[in-house]
């Protein structure tokens, strides 16, 4: 199935219009020059130089005679002159002389026309391209005139000047000039792409490094928090932690309760006190018999470093009670 052809863009339409206008202008110029009798009958100087002839003399309708290093053969072509070398009777072509003569004709044409360098470069390029088939034609004619006993001379000698001419034509600076702006533009675009890629990669590396640093910092903080929680935690999970304020409050309540109980016991002892006479008599009897009885009174005991224990309070929850300066012995 044929694919649909897209409509031409406005840019292409503009180019087509310019091309058509150029073709119309060229046709008009060709029609104007065709009216001249000299333009159709007498060829240009470049065509005459390619034919190895002189330029058209004034009022003539054909090129002039052959150049100095050429001679006209039976068919009317200008061929190189025969040069007999010592010891050999074979004719040898002089391509250097032919090229030099063509170059002289082109230089003479440039001087007469007075063209600028921009117009001379395409002419030189066209001459270099047209010299190659002219040289091959001269060598083919020279090979036909050789003796039939030496057929290998034409096959071995013809490709040598062909390669030299092609190398000379390809080494011209005219063919490399149109490629310079395109190469500069391509190099600039490549440099811009490389710079953009380097900036993007450096930004990505910076973001990755920042994220990695933040992650490491968070990991360290969590490790420190876990270590502090395990180090400061209780040895056994069943025993609750008691603050120092709670311990002091419990000790104050215990001391208050102890003082209250002591006051009550003292009051009861005062109401149930026996007569002093009986006590004195019994003490005398005991002293006489030598049997001594020791009584301990809580109020007379030293209270410097004595620990107070109240049976009504549970001391297992307290780690270590703070002994007060006025601690009293436990009740009995």
Curated annotation (Swiss-Prot):
GO cellular component annotations of the record: membrane
Organism lineage string: Eukaryota, Metazoa, Chordata, Craniata, Vertebrata
Subcellular location: Membrane
Pfam families: NPDC1
Biased composition range(s): Pro residues: 322-332
Role played: Suppresses oncogenic transformation in neural and non-neural cells and down-regulates neural cell proliferation. Might be involved in transcriptional regulation.
Organism encoding this protein: Mus musculus
Major location category of this protein: membrane
Membrane protein topology class: Single-pass membrane protein
Disulfide pairings: none
UniProt protein name: Neural proliferation differentiation and control protein 1
Position of the signal peptide: 1-34
Membrane spanning residue stretches: 191-211
Phosphoserine PTM positions: 236
Family under the similarity heading: Belongs to the NPDC1/cab-1 family.
InterPro entries for this protein: NPDC1
Keywords: Membrane, Phosphoprotein, Signal, Transmembrane, Transmembrane helix
Keyword Membrane assigned: yes
Tissue spec. comment: Expressed in the brain and nervous system. Not detected in liver, heart, skeletal muscle, spleen, pancreas, pituitary and adrenal glands. Expression increases when cultured neural cells are growth-arrested and begin to differentiate.
Region (Disordered): 145-182, 272-300, 312-332
Compositionally biased spans, kind Polar residues: 153-174
Compositional bias of kind Acidic residues: 282-291
């Amino acid at each position: 199935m044929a694919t649909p052809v897209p409509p031409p863009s406005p840019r292409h339409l503009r180019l087509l219009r310019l091309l058509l206008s150029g073709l119309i202008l060229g046709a008009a110029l060709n029609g104007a020059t065709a009216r001249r009798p000299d333009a159709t009958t007498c060829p240009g100087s470049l065509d005459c130089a390619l034919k190895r002839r002189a330029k058209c003399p004034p009022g003539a309708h054909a090129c002039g005679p052959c150049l100095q290093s050429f001679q006209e053969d039976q068919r009317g072509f200008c061929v190189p002159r025969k040069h007999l070398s010592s010891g050999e009777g074979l004719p040898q072509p002089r391509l250097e002389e032919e090229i030099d003569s063509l170059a002289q004709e082109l230089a003479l044409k440039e001087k007469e026309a007075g063209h600028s360098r921009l117009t001379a470069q395409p002419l030189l390029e066209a001459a270099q391209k047209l010299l190659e088939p002219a040289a091959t034609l001269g060598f083919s004619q020279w090979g036909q005139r050789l003796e039939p006993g030496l057929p290998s001379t034409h096959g071995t000698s013809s490709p040598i000047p062909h390669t030299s001419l092609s190398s000379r034509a390809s080494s011209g600076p005219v063919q490399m000039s149109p490629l310079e702006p395109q190469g500069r533009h391509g190099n600039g675009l490549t440099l811009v792409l490389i710079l953009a890629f380097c900036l993007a990669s450096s930004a990505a590396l910076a973001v990755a490094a920042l994220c990695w640093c933040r992650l490491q910092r968070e990991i360290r903080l969590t490790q420190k928090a876990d270590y502090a929680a395990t180090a400061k935690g209780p040895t056994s999970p069943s025993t609750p932690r008691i603050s120092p304020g709670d311990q002091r409050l419990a000790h104050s309540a215990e001391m208050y309760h102890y003082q209250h109980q002591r006051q009550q016991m003292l009051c009861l002892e005062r109401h149930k006190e026996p007569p002093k006479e009986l006590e004195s008599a019994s003490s005398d009897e005991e002293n006489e018999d030598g049997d001594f009885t020791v009584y301990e009174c809580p109020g007379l005991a030293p209270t410097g470093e004595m620990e107070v224990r109240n049976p009504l309070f549970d001391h297992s929850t307290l780690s270590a009670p703070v002994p007060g300066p006025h601690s009293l012995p436990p009740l009995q």
